[in-house]
Amino acid sequence: MRYDVIIIGAGPGGIFSAYELTKQAPDLKVAVFEAGHELKRRKCPIDGTKIKSCVGCDSCSVMSGFGGAGAFSDGKYNITNDFGGSLYEYIGKNEAIDLMKYVDDINMEYGGEGTKLYSTAGTRFKTVCLQNRLHLLDASVRHLGTDINYIVLENLYAYLQDKVEFYFDTPIQTVETVSYTHLRAHETLMNL
Protein backbone atom coordinates (compact mmCIF):
# COMPACT_ATOMS: atom_id res chain seq x y z
CA MET A 1 0.00 0.00 0.00
CA ARG A 2 1.39 3.38 -0.98
CA TYR A 3 -0.27 6.65 -0.09
CA ASP A 4 0.65 10.30 -0.31
CA VAL A 5 -0.78 10.87 3.16
CA ILE A 6 -1.52 8.46 5.99
CA ILE A 7 -3.66 9.67 8.87
CA ILE A 8 -3.58 7.68 12.07
CA GLY A 9 -6.87 7.92 13.93
CA ALA A 10 -10.40 8.79 12.80
CA GLY A 11 -11.23 11.12 15.66
CA PRO A 12 -12.01 14.79 14.96
CA GLY A 13 -8.39 15.60 14.02
CA GLY A 14 -8.20 12.71 11.57
CA ILE A 15 -11.65 13.34 10.10
CA PHE A 16 -11.04 17.03 9.49
CA SER A 17 -7.51 16.41 8.18
CA ALA A 18 -8.93 13.97 5.64
CA TYR A 19 -11.75 16.41 4.82
CA GLU A 20 -9.33 19.27 4.16
CA LEU A 21 -7.07 17.11 2.03
CA THR A 22 -10.04 16.11 -0.16
CA LYS A 23 -10.89 19.78 -0.63
CA GLN A 24 -7.40 21.28 -0.99
CA ALA A 25 -5.54 18.45 -2.72
CA PRO A 26 -8.10 16.04 -4.20
CA ASP A 27 -5.48 14.20 -6.28
CA LEU A 28 -3.61 12.94 -3.23
CA LYS A 29 -4.05 9.31 -2.27
CA VAL A 30 -5.07 9.40 1.40
CA ALA A 31 -5.59 6.59 3.90
CA VAL A 32 -6.97 6.74 7.43
CA PHE A 33 -6.03 3.97 9.84
CA GLU A 34 -8.29 3.60 12.88
CA ALA A 35 -7.92 1.13 15.75
CA GLY A 36 -11.67 1.09 16.34
CA HIS A 37 -14.75 0.30 14.30
CA GLU A 38 -16.54 2.27 11.63
CA LEU A 39 -19.35 4.41 13.06
CA LYS A 40 -22.25 2.03 12.36
CA ARG A 41 -20.41 -0.85 14.09
CA ARG A 42 -19.63 1.07 17.28
CA LYS A 43 -21.74 -0.61 19.97
CA CYS A 44 -20.88 -1.08 23.64
CA PRO A 45 -22.17 -4.40 25.04
CA ILE A 46 -23.06 -2.82 28.40
CA ASP A 47 -26.85 -2.84 28.54
CA GLY A 48 -27.36 -2.20 32.27
CA THR A 49 -29.25 -5.47 32.72
CA LYS A 50 -27.30 -8.54 31.60
CA ILE A 51 -23.98 -6.76 31.18
CA LYS A 52 -23.41 -4.06 33.79
CA SER A 53 -19.71 -3.37 33.50
CA CYS A 54 -16.88 -3.31 31.00
CA VAL A 55 -16.07 -6.68 29.44
CA GLY A 56 -12.75 -5.54 27.98
CA CYS A 57 -13.52 -5.54 24.26
CA ASP A 58 -10.48 -5.62 21.97
CA SER A 59 -11.64 -2.29 20.61
CA CYS A 60 -13.67 -0.12 23.00
CA SER A 61 -16.55 1.32 20.98
CA VAL A 62 -17.05 4.09 23.52
CA MET A 63 -13.50 5.39 23.21
CA SER A 64 -12.35 4.50 19.70
CA GLY A 65 -13.66 4.24 16.18
CA PHE A 66 -14.84 6.75 13.59
CA GLY A 67 -15.66 9.98 15.42
CA GLY A 68 -13.29 9.30 18.30
CA ALA A 69 -14.19 9.34 21.98
CA GLY A 70 -16.72 12.14 21.44
CA ALA A 71 -18.86 10.35 18.85
CA PHE A 72 -21.59 9.59 21.37
CA SER A 73 -21.21 12.76 23.42
CA ASP A 74 -23.77 15.54 23.60
CA GLY A 75 -22.00 17.32 20.76
CA LYS A 76 -20.79 20.51 22.41
CA TYR A 77 -18.18 22.33 20.35
CA ASN A 78 -16.39 25.21 22.08
CA ILE A 79 -15.27 28.19 20.03
CA THR A 80 -12.78 29.89 22.32
CA ASN A 81 -9.10 30.33 23.07
CA ASP A 82 -9.78 30.63 26.82
CA PHE A 83 -9.81 26.88 27.47
CA GLY A 84 -9.63 23.52 25.76
CA GLY A 85 -6.39 23.83 23.85
CA SER A 86 -3.41 25.90 22.86
CA LEU A 87 -3.65 26.12 19.06
CA TYR A 88 -3.62 29.93 19.32
CA GLU A 89 -0.08 29.78 20.72
CA TYR A 90 1.09 28.49 17.34
CA ILE A 91 -1.05 30.37 14.84
CA GLY A 92 -2.43 33.36 16.75
CA LYS A 93 -5.74 33.95 18.52
CA ASN A 94 -7.70 35.32 15.56
CA GLU A 95 -6.54 32.54 13.24
CA ALA A 96 -7.45 29.89 15.82
CA ILE A 97 -10.95 31.33 16.25
CA ASP A 98 -11.34 31.49 12.45
CA LEU A 99 -10.44 27.79 12.20
CA MET A 100 -12.90 26.88 14.97
CA LYS A 101 -15.63 28.80 13.14
CA TYR A 102 -14.67 27.04 9.91
CA VAL A 103 -15.10 23.64 11.60
CA ASP A 104 -18.43 24.86 12.99
CA ASP A 105 -19.50 25.81 9.45
CA ILE A 106 -18.62 22.31 8.24
CA ASN A 107 -20.61 20.76 11.10
CA MET A 108 -23.57 22.93 10.09
CA GLU A 109 -23.21 21.92 6.43
CA TYR A 110 -23.17 18.22 7.28
CA GLY A 111 -26.30 18.07 9.41
CA GLY A 112 -25.98 20.54 12.26
CA GLU A 113 -27.96 23.38 10.69
CA GLY A 114 -30.59 24.80 13.00
CA THR A 115 -28.71 23.97 16.20
CA LYS A 116 -28.10 26.74 18.68
CA LEU A 117 -24.88 28.64 19.28
CA TYR A 118 -24.67 29.79 22.90
CA SER A 119 -22.37 32.46 24.32
CA THR A 120 -21.34 33.58 27.79
CA ALA A 121 -20.21 37.03 26.61
CA GLY A 122 -22.41 39.92 27.69
CA THR A 123 -24.89 37.75 29.60
CA ARG A 124 -26.60 38.48 32.89
CA PHE A 125 -24.99 35.32 34.23
CA LYS A 126 -21.53 36.73 33.51
CA THR A 127 -22.46 39.94 35.34
CA VAL A 128 -23.62 37.98 38.40
CA CYS A 129 -20.40 35.96 38.34
CA LEU A 130 -18.27 39.11 38.26
CA GLN A 131 -20.31 40.67 41.08
CA ASN A 132 -19.45 37.63 43.18
CA ARG A 133 -15.75 37.64 42.24
CA LEU A 134 -16.07 34.66 39.94
CA HIS A 135 -14.35 34.69 36.57
CA LEU A 136 -16.51 33.11 33.86
CA LEU A 137 -14.49 32.24 30.79
CA ASP A 138 -15.92 33.58 27.54
CA ALA A 139 -16.91 31.05 24.93
CA SER A 140 -19.31 30.41 22.14
CA VAL A 141 -20.61 26.85 22.35
CA ARG A 142 -22.42 25.02 19.58
CA HIS A 143 -24.70 22.39 21.09
CA LEU A 144 -25.53 19.77 18.48
CA GLY A 145 -26.93 17.20 20.88
CA THR A 146 -26.17 13.48 20.81
CA ASP A 147 -28.44 12.63 17.87
CA ILE A 148 -27.35 15.50 15.60
CA ASN A 149 -23.69 14.93 16.50
CA TYR A 150 -24.07 11.35 15.24
CA ILE A 151 -25.81 12.54 12.05
CA VAL A 152 -22.98 14.99 11.33
CA LEU A 153 -20.46 12.15 11.70
CA GLU A 154 -22.53 9.88 9.44
CA ASN A 155 -22.68 12.59 6.79
CA LEU A 156 -18.96 13.36 7.00
CA TYR A 157 -18.20 9.65 6.62
CA ALA A 158 -20.55 9.42 3.63
CA TYR A 159 -18.68 12.31 2.01
CA LEU A 160 -15.22 10.89 2.77
CA GLN A 161 -15.71 7.18 2.10
CA ASP A 162 -15.32 7.46 -1.68
CA LYS A 163 -12.42 9.92 -1.48
CA VAL A 164 -10.27 8.40 1.27
CA GLU A 165 -9.38 4.79 2.03
CA PHE A 166 -10.37 3.82 5.57
CA TYR A 167 -8.82 0.91 7.43
CA PHE A 168 -10.90 0.22 10.52
CA ASP A 169 -9.94 -2.21 13.26
CA THR A 170 -6.33 -1.55 12.29
CA PRO A 171 -4.26 -0.11 15.12
CA ILE A 172 -0.88 1.24 14.10
CA GLN A 173 1.83 0.07 16.47
CA THR A 174 4.89 1.88 15.12
CA VAL A 175 5.97 4.28 12.41
CA GLU A 176 9.53 4.03 11.11
CA THR A 177 11.58 6.29 8.88
CA VAL A 178 12.45 4.57 5.60
CA SER A 179 14.15 7.57 4.00
CA TYR A 180 14.20 11.32 4.30
CA THR A 181 10.85 11.52 2.51
CA HIS A 182 9.19 8.20 3.37
CA LEU A 183 7.75 6.58 6.47
CA ARG A 184 6.40 3.10 7.00
CA ALA A 185 3.53 2.35 9.37
CA HIS A 186 3.38 -1.06 11.01
CA GLU A 187 -0.09 -2.32 11.69
CA THR A 188 -1.55 -5.10 13.74
CA LEU A 189 -4.66 -6.38 12.02
CA MET A 190 -7.35 -7.46 14.45
CA ASN A 191 -9.42 -10.54 13.74
CA LEU A 192 -12.98 -9.58 14.53
Label every PLM stretch briefly.
Residues 24-28:
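Conserved S-adenosyl-L-methionine
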Residues 14:
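N-terminal Rossmann-fold NAD(P) dinucleotide-binding loop
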Residues 168-179:
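A conserved short coil-to-beta-strand element within the FAD-binding core of flavoproteins
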Residues 2-11, 31:
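Beta1/beta-strand and adjacent pyrophosphate-binding region of the FAD-binding site
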Residues 181-188:
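Conserved small/polar residues in nucleotide/adenosyl-binding loops
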Residues 38-42, 46-162:
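Conserved N-terminal/central alpha/beta ligand/cofactor-binding core
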Residues 21:
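Aromatic pocket-lining residues of Rossmann-like dinucleotide-binding sites
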